[in-house]
Amino acid sequence: MKDIYIFAIESSCDETSASIVKNGKVDIATTINTQIDTHKLYGGVVPEVASRLHLENITLVIDETIKKSGMKMEDMDAIAVTYSPGLLGSLLVGVEAAKTLSLVYNKPFIKVNHMMGHILANNIGQDLEYPLISLVISGGHTDLIYMENEGTFKYIGRTLDDAVGECFDKVARILDMPYPGGPNVEKLAKEGKCTIHMPKILDDGSYNFSFSGIKSHVNNLVHNMKQRKEEINKPDIACSFQTCVANSLVEKSLAAIKKYNVKNFTIAGGVASNSYIRESLINMCKENNIKIFIPDKKYCTDNATMIGAAAYVLYKKGMFSDLNVNASSHEELSLEEL
């Protein structure tokens, strides 16, 4: 069988990335240009700044990826790009670059949902087994998704307010920690102990999540301690917060696994790089004889390799797009789409 090479582009937020992926599983070459140092100056991602930096870097990232691979664009079987969801201005840069490559080199064009990319990052270097439950945890999403087979998605739970990564960032700001908040909260939590009471997260029997309550609890806790001029034990707050969040993710995931009677589980998204949360979910699977699939940490945060992995599934299904595709800031995965 002929090897399939897909050139993929990712620009949904604050990383400009390009990758060449073979057969949806082998990372031939990947380049990532991160904007973290720039956005750190503003305390978070500024959409207008992000899109301008994507414009400055997209050509360099594409050229560097081709150079590292030793291949030519003519060797590619398709061009793929993240078209949704994400920051609209950022998405547009990647989409237009991919359209241009598709047109100039006469290659099939594949639009990829960003969340599909995160989930199928688990295909890189390993073979997913179905049916499965996937937990997608990132700055914009906290979703439980049932996949009966490759390329089918059914939402069974989601956040009702803040996404888990967003909550980490907001708690980091409450604790006067710099951007990016999530990794800094995780680092601080390692220095603390779980000594502070945190409220149960949406214990309603559903598979949905809600993080606004624990965020408000931490905010009120810190505010009241400041008012009373008490010493604020930031490591213990971070540790207690992180433990509470991890427990909620474990409880909801396990409930979904049992409900759908599956033996396979994946985690995906940027928050999946959090070591404590990873270990909590790994232990859950060990204790319940569930096979867990986890991407390498470098494939958890935004990258084009995961887009190439997802595009391969669409390639096999013949799901190509015309060049009239537009970027969209909000578009969900659906069974009907695939």
Show which residues each predicted segment covers.
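Conserved phosphate-binding catalytic cores of ATP/NTP-utilizing and phosphoryl-transfer enzymes
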Residues: 1-2, 112-133, 310
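Short beta-strand scaffold segments in enzyme catalytic cores
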Residues: 16-21, 134, 142-146
